[in-house]
């Protein structure tokens, strides 16, 4: 099953923990904010990144 990953860029503080934990799913943009790269089937990695986000800017939903 694929998962849609979203980052609320208004909430994101650019901590980059998500990109460090799950580089296949997140990248840091030129704006200093995290952006999802692709939908993912690696729910464990995406959930770990979402839980690690200090401001709760990451959401996951079934694609």
Curated annotation (Swiss-Prot):
PROSITE patterns: 4FE4S_FER_2 (PS51379). Binds 1 [4Fe-4S] cluster which readily converts to a stable [3Fe-4S] form. InterPro entries: 3Fe4S_ferredoxin, 4Fe4S_Fe-S-bd, Fe-S_cluster_ET. GO terms for molecular function: 3 iron, 4 sulfur cluster binding; 4 iron, 4 sulfur cluster binding; electron transfer activity; iron ion binding. Its cofactor is [4Fe-4S] cluster; [3Fe-4S] cluster. Keywords: 3Fe-4S, 4Fe-4S, Disulfide bond, Electron transport, Iron, Iron-sulfur, Metal-binding, Repeat, Transport. Ferredoxins are iron-sulfur proteins that transfer electrons in a wide variety of metabolic reactions. This is Ferredoxin. It comes from Thermococcus kodakarensis (strain ATCC BAA-918 / JCM 12380 / KOD1). The gene is fdxA.
């Amino acid at each position: 099953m694929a998962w849609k990953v979203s980052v609320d860029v208004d909430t994101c503080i650019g901590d980059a923990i998500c990109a460090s934990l799950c580089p296949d799913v997140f990248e840091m943009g030129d704006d200093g904010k995290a952006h999802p790269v692709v939908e993912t089937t690696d729910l464990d990695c995406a959930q770990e990144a979402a839980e690690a986000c200090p401001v709760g800017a990451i959401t996951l939903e079934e694609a």
